[in-house]
């Protein structure tokens, strides 16, 4: 593969030029997209069957499906968010609005019947929140923009910990990872210079031997 070619070339004292047009015999151009000069992040689904392309500065995500026959990703198409239309709106597909969507992660949803169904969570940097996208393209706000705390000072941003939607607030969040073993999100709060956590814990009601609803809240982490 290309990885082996790269290693051999560097090991033998050579250089490596990653520009496709300069190396037509090494790289294969799969497709071009409308925003080559903007910031991109690519998130490949755990099954490898599709990927999301996040266009940070133009406020939307594209989706590229994997062609099993050709063994390559096809030209991506607009999936959620409006091309060059920043804003804040929970909605479906291209009707949703976001503002500088940054890092995201796929998280398996056990409520879905399919074994390959994952929700996609991402940080919406200039909307100061964590958003969620279902496989069908339904965009919702998962955490941040505290409905109650924002009433006190009129800001959707802040450093409050607590209930995900009523209390918790973030400021310019740019990073997000998920620990499957701990069932915990780690959120990079850029302006606050902190790593915040969101836990999804399900406590057991010993008396009734039943599960009570999930306790989801944010806390500051020193990890």
Can you name each region flagged by the protein language model?
Residues 1-6:
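Short, small-residue-biased leader/transition segments that mark boundaries at the very start
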Residues 10-17, 64-71, 199-204:
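Short loop/turn segments immediately following beta-strands, especially the blade-tip
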Residues 11-38, 72-102, 138-174:
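Gly/Pro-rich loop segments of beta-rich domains
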Residues 45-47, 107, 179:
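Structural WD40 beta-propeller signal
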Residues 50-53, 119-122, 184-187:
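Conserved beta-propeller blade signature
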Residues 56-57, 66, 125-126, 190:
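Short loop/turn segments immediately following the C-termini of beta-strands
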Residues 172-208:
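Blade-level signature of beta-propeller repeat domains, shared across WD40, Kelch, NHL, RCC1
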């Amino acid at each position: 593969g290309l990885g082996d070619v790269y290693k051999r070339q560097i090991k033998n004292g050579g250089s490596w030029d990653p520009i496709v047009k300069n190396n037509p015999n090494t790289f294969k151009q799969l497709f071009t997209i409308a925003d080559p000069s903007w910031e991109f992040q690519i998130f490949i689904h755990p099954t490898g069957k599709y990927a999301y392309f996040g266009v940070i500065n133009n406020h939307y995500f594209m989706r590229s499906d994997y062609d099993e026959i050709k063994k390559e990703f096809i030209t991506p198409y607009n999936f959620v968010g409006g091309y060059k239309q920043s804003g804040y709106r929970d909605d479906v597909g291209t009707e949703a609005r976001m503002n500088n969507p940054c890092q995201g992660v796929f998280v398996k949803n056990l409520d879905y019947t399919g074994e390959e169904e994952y929700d996609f969570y991402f940080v919406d940097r200039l909307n100061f929140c964590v958003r969620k996208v279902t496989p069908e393209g339904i965009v919702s706000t998962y955490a941040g923009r505290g409905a109650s705390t924002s009433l006190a000072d009129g800001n959707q941003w802040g450093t409050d910990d607590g209930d995900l939607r009523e209390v918790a607030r973030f400021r310019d969040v740019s990073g997000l990872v998920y620990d499957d073993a701990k069932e915990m999100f780690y959120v990079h709060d850029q302006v606050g210079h902190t790593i915040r956590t969101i836990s999804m814990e399900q406590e057991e009601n010993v008396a009734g031997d039943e599960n009570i609803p999930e306790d989801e809240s944010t806390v500051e982490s020193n990890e």
